[in-house]
């Protein structure tokens, strides 16, 4: 089996369905004997360019290990799911299990928001 990194972008109106989509894709992978090494929900982020007149979308990153038939099935699911605006599948040399650079940035932003919220609560 080979290692892959998958990033897909979901329509912002469908953001509440992202956890169900992730579970569906995870069950597809595991039911065919694959493994999931990392799943990161990057949340709603600014797009680099407009896609279908949208400026923001919901990003999800998955690092998996699977065979070609499972990968074909996932790609088919991405293509025929109207909520998925774009997807990218990249073959990796080894499994990535640590947080991605994008996730580190998301964690930094959340830490800043939490730090800003604490002094505001202390003053109230």
Swiss-Prot record:
| Single GO biological process annotation from the record | translation
Q: Where is this region: Disordered?
A: 96-124
GO CC entries = cytosolic small ribosomal subunit
Which GO molecular function entries does the Swiss-Prot or TrEMBL record give? Answer: small ribosomal subunit rRNA binding; structural constituent of ribosome
Q: Which Pfam families match?
A: Ribosomal_S6 (PF01250)
Q: Which SUPFAM superfamilies match?
A: Ribosomal protein S6
Signal peptide segment: none
Q: Does the keyword Disulfide bond apply?
A: no
- UniProt keyword terms in alphabetical order: Ribonucleoprotein, Ribosomal protein, RNA-binding, rRNA-binding
What InterPro entries does the annotation carry? Ribosomal_bS6 (IPR000529), Ribosomal_bS6_sf (IPR035980), Ribosomal_S6_plastid/chlpt (IPR020814), Transl_elong_EF1B/ribsomal_bS6 (IPR014717)
Family membership, please give it. Answer: Belongs to the bacterial ribosomal protein bS6 family.
Task: Relate the protein's function as given in its record.
Answer: Binds together with bS18 to 16S ribosomal RNA.
The protein's matches in HAMAP family, at most eight in alphabetical order, are given as:
Ribosomal_bS6
Question: What is the protein name for this chain?
Answer: Small ribosomal subunit protein bS6
Task: List the source organism.
Answer: Burkholderia orbicola (strain MC0-3)
Name the gene behind this protein.
Answer: rpsF
